[in-house]
Amino acid sequence: MTLLGSAAVAMWWDISPATKAEFENWHSHEHFPERMRIPGFRRGSRWADLAGGEGFFVLYELDSYDILASPAYLARLNDPTPWSTQMMPHHRNMVRSQCRISESFGGGIGQYMLTLRVSPVPGKEEALHREIRSRLAALPEIPGLTGAHLLKTETPKLVETTEQRIRGGDAVADWIVLLSGYDADVLDQIGREALAAALVAAGAREAPQAATYRLSYSLAATDLAA
């Protein structure tokens, strides 16, 4: 998949089996449409843990970085709906990263997504970025893969929002590598093995934290009726 715009919000969290059905209903029919009606939001996608675990990965693609601090977005973050207020406490082990899209290669939306959370060794940022860019550029041409991207977290300097207070505080990832494709085995082989080892050799602080997901739902702003 080609990422839309130049900024993104990348999130990971766990949902218990007892809450999953209501969560997916709320997230698909209220929360995603609400977010996609915010000016500058281009597309949202929700990905479920491939192994059937409790984890979800959610990605919002935005026109530009300044959308993260826009009055329209902050208004929603500080005035959640009653259903959102009910569901937010069920987001366990929340990681929420507000990012600039640094590199994006490929096209289309694959069925699977592998996420790698990476932190550079201080002083190795440029070397690590060069290695990531070089490797990601070639990956979408490999059978089984369709997209490869690098996001870098840059958190806006804002006061804590109402949604964050409801969840009890969010952790933050650093750099995020996303690989998408239609063959989960190829995705894992390249992402968890070859790419992960290359990143450590190029200046990643430790082995990237990897997880693989299957597409659950996607909604673009253009999908909504005017």
Name each model-derived stretch.
Residues 1-226:
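Macromolecular interaction modules
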